[in-house]
Amino acid sequence: MSEGYIVLVMQLVLIELNEINFEYAKKYFDILKIDTIKNINKELIETESENSDEMLEPWIQWHSIHTGCTAKDHGVFRLGDAINSKKIQIFEELEANHLTVGSISAMNSINNLKNPSYFIPDPWTNTKSDDSFFSKIITLVLKDTVNNNASAKFSIKNYIYLIIIFLRFV
């Protein structure tokens, strides 16, 4: 006689929306009849961590969200400062609890994952992507584009990479 097993598959999707006005967004959710987004909107959790305006910068707030610490506790106050932080992020916590973790451009987060499914850092944080070819070239194109934005430079190499990325994913 064979034994039966129940396999529980747990999924968590964290979508980070930066500087969204939810009053306006809700109107679009209603007009476009996007039920999934409307359901997410019903279950929003509002939190407070800072009470001074200078601590409300998104790169500070996102690191607070990723670590569960206040700005004072994590000490990250500028874009890219996360690389100096020793705080454990949600990504490592999830991986330690046997979840597969992937991240695309989570602001001011660092790749301390042992085995990411994928990891593409934000363009301002000097941390590595995962080891896949596509994550590496997407990271390179993002960083080059953002960091050379003021000079309006876009290299031929990046155009070629974009074509490769487009052909692979679109």
Regions found by a protein language model. Give the residues of each.
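Short, Lys/Arg-enriched N-terminal segments with co-localized hydrophobic residues
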Residues: 1-9
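Short linear interaction motif-like sites in intrinsically disordered regions of transcription factors
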Residues: 2, 60-63, 125
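Intrinsically disordered, low-complexity N-terminal regions enriched in serine/proline/glycine
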Residues: 4, 27, 158-160
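Intrinsically disordered, low-complexity regions
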Residues: 9, 17, 34, 112-117
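Beta-strand elements within well-structured catalytic alpha/beta cores of enzymes
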Residues: 10-25, 65, 94
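Short, charged/polar micro-motifs that form catalytic or ligand-binding hotspots
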Residues: 11, 15, 55, 80-84
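Short, structured active-site-proximal loop/turn typified by the sulfatase FGly-forming signature C/S-X-P-X-R
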Residues: 23-62, 70-73, 100-102
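His/Asp/Glu-rich, glycine-adjacent segments
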Residues: 68-170
